[in-house]
Amino acid sequence: MNVMNITDIKKYIPHRYPFLLIDRVIKIEKDKSLVAIKNVTVNEPFFTGHFPVRPVMPGVLIIESLAQAAGILIVKSLNLPEGHKDIYFFAGVDNARFKRVVEPGDQLTLEVKVLKVHRGLWKFEGKATVDDQLACKAELMTIKG
């Protein structure tokens, strides 16, 4: 499957509003990579306090968006069924860098690539862009909880 809409996404990861931070998956290569979209709207609950004068998406939520994309890639790579109960947790975040702010109206393109899988620990390279401009990059590690 190369495309997943929000209904499909909810069948494979446990996140729900206000912490479901992926709107669509546009490309999946099992065991390799995934590309997803997050449409950032002014109605996001975090904009109320971050920041009222100039709304900016918190960097930790950009990282979380990448982690959710990685979670979908894991589930699809392992051929887990819809409604599975497995949950993958952060094991680490390395080399996180933020290069541009993400504001209401932006569309985040989230790309994750598998770097390594060892003993159930998955390591990914993640990149979030807006209009082909790098917003965030990081290495993410996850493990089944």
UniProtKB/Swiss-Prot annotation:
Please provide, alphabetically and separated by semicolons, the GO molecular function terms listed in this UniProt record. Answer: (3R)-hydroxyacyl-[acyl-carrier-protein] dehydratase activity
User: Mainly resides where?
Assistant: cytoplasm
Enzyme Commission code(s) on record: 4.2.1.59
Give the enzyme's main class according to its UniProt record, as a single word. lyase
| A single Gene Ontology CC term | cytoplasm
Q: Which UniProt keywords apply?
A: Cytoplasm, Lipid A biosynthesis, Lipid biosynthesis, Lipid metabolism, Lyase
- Which catalytic residues are annotated? 50
Question: Which subcellular locations apply to this protein?
Answer: Cytoplasm
InterPro entries reported in the protein's UniProt record: FabA_FabZ, FabZ, HotDog_dom_sf
Q: Which reaction is recorded as catalysed by this protein?
A: a (3R)-hydroxyacyl-[ACP] = a (2E)-enoyl-[ACP] + H2O
Query: Pfam families, from UniProt?
Result: FabA (PF07977)
Q: Biological process GO terms, please?
A: fatty acid biosynthetic process; lipid A biosynthetic process
Sorted alphabetically, which Gene3D superfamilies does this protein's record hold?
Answer: Hotdog Thioesterase (3.10.129.10)
What is the role of the protein in this entry? Involved in unsaturated fatty acids biosynthesis. Catalyzes the dehydration of short chain beta-hydroxyacyl-ACPs and long chain saturated and unsaturated beta-hydroxyacyl-ACPs.
User: What family is reported?
Assistant: Belongs to the thioester dehydratase family. FabZ subfamily.
Q: Which HAMAP family match?
A: FabZ (MF_00406)
The name of this protein is: 3-hydroxyacyl-[acyl-carrier-protein] dehydratase FabZ
Question: Where does this protein come from, organism-wise?
Answer: Coxiella burnetii (strain RSA 493 / Nine Mile phase I)
